[in-house]
A protein has these predicted regions:
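N-terminal module-boundary/linker segments of secreted carbohydrate-active enzymes
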Residues: 32-137, 255
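Conserved aromatic anchor
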Residues: 652-665, 741-752, 837-846
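Short carbohydrate-recognition loop motifs
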Residues: 501-530
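Sec-dependent signal peptide cleavage junction
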Residues: 19-37
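Beta-strand-rich modules
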Residues: 693-718, 788-808, 878-894
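Extra-cytoplasmic beta-strand recognition segments
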Residues: 487, 529-561, 592-594, 627, ...
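Extracellular fibronectin type III
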Residues: 714-728, 805-820, 893-906
């Protein structure tokens, strides 16, 4: 349908230039003429830390995992888990229907992407506690990603270009899928200098090239769909095409949510309702179903919401599946109550529609700017605010109020009016089958504990390790005015600030049993209190049992703890299973196990802990460290296979591992451990993935091996696969210098005897015209040079392996960096005629460009990539020949060879 001949012309011009400059360059050779002085300014290895970039639409068209940075490291692998059917009898609000859904946007990030202090992170884990971890999956149905800068934009740079597409990080998708929640990438327009019309075209075979790549991107990275935020007007002639493209994606299993922006005419006009002006993007008589749902703009009224619901019904659509009323989290915070201010519920208190929160991470990202929100002492505040937002102002499910709670201790000075989403959205669960295990590990910690002992003495964040958390955070039912407080206990290294001053916690900080956190229940205990923990659908067999690992640091008292179970067969009755001697102070962690054989054939619908005392107990505390429901069978997986060292980087001590991924039905996670020279073992990290990047090893110089264990459905670990790490016969102090079309590499040989060093240069996820090369040099040379055809700033990995006299090879050392940039690729796009008869230039595919100089009839216009304008609506002569000469300039000031586009009588033409 569209002409693409210009791309070939641009490619030929580029190829001719490269050949003319670099003809006759020699093969790689030992660098006999390179001295230590030549590389005295050489640089050490860069960090290999994975980070996620935003995608321009031209990046989408060219998407290929082989050239997309960190494509192997950023894949989500956990399959979407099926949620249990709603069981009202065990809900905090038994009258609440399961109709209303919840979409939380921005919770697919560890941190905001809009600040210099935060890396544009998308990795599996980080050596830092102070990241935002979403903990309320039970209310969410969809989670989204915030914007991300495009590839090769320096962190902290004032020149930011955000991608049209932002993909949720893999760790968020893994955690979401574990909890039955789908994840959506964000599509946002306008993103100058990109524009919509560039990618809206259909191929002659009926396919949509861009749409197909969006489908491919979702399937490769493991997320489920897209939130289409089209806030730029398009010509009405494009509307049917746009809808066909969305339909094309939907028919391939991709979920689509449309924002209340562009209407039937293509113009942006926020309806703040679902009506005939925008419903065609969801369903119309000509095309049928298009997008799955719509996100309503925020300026609605009760009447608008009521009419939106009815409009969906009139179209034969489920209003709760289709219509999501927008909630502007960062603007409203706790000050706006959707029920009293917007009358968003009917006379029975039922919402008219579902909900979508824009800026759902506001409770973490909008406080203590610019740095305090990433300090340990303020993280307790963020977690309190999150709990208030999703549960209630009192942090107790089923207990709601507006305008009566004030919490200036969490940096919120106004009265809390928001009542919490648990009032409108029912809690959901994926806990089913016959086995379940939780360590109450919420995904980050000041340390990592294993069996109650510190196994990693460093801060960490890793959503992949987050357990399925308690269904209610919190829901405590008390027989009197006393009610225990609940907190995540991160151990004695955790601290907090209150109004800028360091403050203490009112419980003994114990830490975790496994992971980074345990659940502390503390305060005054008298009478009976029930701490509701999990909503489940667990089958009980004759061999079933339930075990609880707990720690009671408070003194001996008259208290009694009982596991409380509700069965589906008779939800009006609670079965209590006493824990012997539970009133006694424990010396560390202890485990109580109770047989469930007497209830074989029944189904556990809810698990709670009932605590009681015959007299008032002050300063009571009990920590929960592990809960296991077992069917009496072994669910320990086999040891992992295929464990290998991919890279071990010189200088940074970063390590990249890979192994064979087991089936999620039997393997729920992988744990990585470091083995030390004294025989001890420490936890490193983990994920359900086929690879793992290690940012930091404690006492790396003493590590002799790495072990990987698979984790089963019952929380048990497999035997370890072990990978020895060599401490000898490895080169060190690797440095490189990229100049004069040579990459000079130096290193220090090990003291041990060997014959040669094999040096290999590999271009990393690169489309560069440079070729991979291998050089072999003798022991003692300690240097090599690689000829570089094109100094284009490409990233590369150099691997250095010592080779023994018998040909056997020792452990490889890796080095990661980028070439000097002295080259700007030429413009490789094309000119297209838009509906107004003017010319739109497609975005340059090259990652590294800053300015575009467009010369027409002797007049040159400069277009800026950052904060500039799109290369659209350019004028050419309607009669005769127009030559358009385009020159690009990159961020280092290099200018490309000019490319000439021809237009004859206002239409693209070729030299033919």
């Amino acid at each position: 349908m569209k002409q693409h001949s210009q791309k070939l012309l641009s490619l030929l011009l580029c190829l001719a230039m490269v050949l003319s400059v670099f003809a006759g360059m020699g093969a790689p050779a030992a660098a006999a003429d390179v001295t230590a002085e030549d590389v005295s300014q050489g640089k050490a290895s860069s960090s290999f830390e994975p980070w996620g970039h935003g995608y321009r639409m031209v990046d989408i068209l060219n998407f290929d995992p082989a050239t997309d940075p960190y494509s192997q490291e950023l894949v989500a692998s956990v399959p979407l888990q099926e949620r249990n059917a709603t069981f009202a009898a065990t809900q905090a609000n038994k009258d609440l229907s399961d109709d209303s859904k919840l979409y939380v946007i921005s919770s697919g990030n560890y941190r905001s992407t809009d600040v210099n202090e935060a890396p544009w992170n998308a990795g599996m884990s980080y050596d830092d506690f102070s990241y935002n971890l979403f903990k309320f999956w039970q209310y969410a149905d969809m989670v989204g990603a915030g914007g991300r800068p495009t590839q090769n934009i320096a962190i902290g740079s004032a020149d930011k270009e955000y991608g049209i597409i932002a993909v949720p990080m893999a760790a968020a998708t893994n955690a979401a899928h574990k909890n039955g929640v789908i994840t959506l990438a964000e599509y946002f327009i306008p993103r100058t200098p990109q524009y919509t019309e560039e990618w809206l075209y259909q191929a002659e075979d009926g396919s949509f090239p861009y749409a197909q790549k969006l489908v491919d991107l979702a399937k490769y990275y493991g997320f489920d769909g897209y939130f289409i935020n089209q806030e730029a007007s398009i010509d009405s002639s494009y509307v049917p095409l746009f809808r066909e493209m969305l339909k094309y994606m939907r028919e391939q299993g991709v979920y689509i949510q449309w924002y209340d922006s562009a209407t039937e005419s293509g113009g942006v006009s926020y309806q703040n309702a679902f009506n005939s002006n925008n419903s065609g993007w969801i369903w119309n008589e000509t095309q049928g179903h298009v997008a799955h749902s719509i996100f309503l703009n925020y300026w609605y009224s009760s009447t608008a919401l009521k009419n939106s619901k009815q409009h969906a019904i009139d179209l034969g659509l489920d209003p709760y599946e289709v219509v999501f009323m927008g909630v502007e989290g960062g603007q409203w915070e706790f000050g706006t109550d959707i029920e009293t201010r917007y009358n968003a519920v009917d006379e029975n208190g039922k919402p008219y529609t579902s909900f979508a929160i824009w800026g759902s991470d506001w409770y973490h990202e909008q406080f203590h700017k610019p740095n305090g929100r990433y300090e340990v002492g303020y993280q307790w505040e963020a977690e309190e605010r999150e709990r208030i937002y999703y549960t209630s102002a009192t942090e107790n499910a089923g207990e709601y109020s507006t305008g009566t709670v004030k919490r200036d201790d969490i940096s919120y000075d106004d009265t809390i009016n928001f009542q919490g989403f648990s009032k409108y959205v029912v809690e959901k669960s994926v806990i089913n089958g016959a086995s379940f295990a939780s360590d109450f590990n919420n995904g980050h910690g000041m340390q990592y504990y294993r069996n109650g002992r510190v196994s990693r003495d460093m801060e960490w964040t890793n959503l992949n390790l987050q357990d399925i958390l308690p269904t209610w955070q919190w829901w405590v039912q008390s027989a009197d005015e006393n009610r225990l407080e609940l907190d995540w206990d991160y151990g004695p290294k955790f601290f907090r600030y209150v109004n800028g001053e360091e403050d203490h916690f009112n419980y003994t900080q114990i830490g975790a049993y496994n992971g980074g956190s345990s659940l502390a229940m503390h305060g005054a205990l008298a009478g009976s209190q029930t701490v509701n923990l999990y909503k489940t659908k667990l089958d009980v067999t004759a061999d079933s049992s339930i075990s609880l690992t707990y720690n009671k640091p408070s003194a001996d008292d008259t208290s009694k703890a009982q596991i409380a179970l509700i069965f589906e067969e008779d939800p009006t009755q609670t079965v209590y299973l006493p824990i012997e001697n539970s009133g006694k102070k424990t010396e560390g962690w202890t485990t109580a196990t109770v047989s469930l054989g007497a209830y074989a054939g029944k189904t556990i619908a809810a698990i709670a802990l009932e605590l009681s005392a015959t007299e008032l107990v002050e300063n009571y505390q009990l920590n929960l460290g592990r809960l296991v429901v077992s069917d009496g069978q072994s669910h320990t997986p086999a040891a992992p296979t295929g464990l290998k060292l991919v890279n071990r980087f010189d200088g940074t001590n970063e390590i990249q591992l890979a192994w064979d991924l087991g089936d999620y039905d039997t393997v729920k996670n992988y744990h990585v451990y470091a083995v030390y020279a004294d025989g001890t073992e420490r936890f490193v990290g983990g994920a359900y993935a086929a690879n793992y990047y290690i940012q930091t090893l404690e006492n790396a110089e003493s590590v002799t091996a790495l072990r990987v264990r698979a984790v089963g459905v019952d929380g048990s670990e497999s035997a370890a696969a072990e990978l020895p790490l060599a401490s000898t016969c490895r080169v060190s102090n690797v440095r490189t210098l990229s100049e004069n079309n040579m990459l000079n590499v130096t290193w220090t040989d090990p003291a041990e005897s060997f014959a040669k060093v094999e040096a290999t240069l590999t271009y990393w996820y690169s489309e560069t015209t440079n070729e991979n090369q291998t050089i072999t040099v003798n022991q003692g040379d300690q240097k090599a040079s690689f000829p570089i055809e094109l100094e284009d700033g490409a990233q590369y990995i150099v691997t250095l392996t010592t080779v023994n006299a018998d040909g056997t090879k020792n452990e490889t050392v890796s080095y990661f960096s980028d070439l000097t940039d002295k080259y700007c690729a030429p413009y490789d796009g094309e000119g297209r005629v838009n509906p107004s008869g003017r010319i739109n230039l497609t975005t340059p595919a090259v990652d590294d460009w800053n300015l575009a100089y467009v010369e027409v009839d002797g007049n040159t216009t400069t277009y800026r990539r950052f904060g500039g304008s799109s290369m659209a609506n350019l004028s050419v002569k309607k009669d005769g020949l127009t030559l358009m000469v385009i020159t690009l300039e990159d961020m280092d000031g290099n200018k490309s060879q000019p490319v000439t586009l021809m237009f004859l009588n206002g239409q693209p033409a070729t030299a033919d």
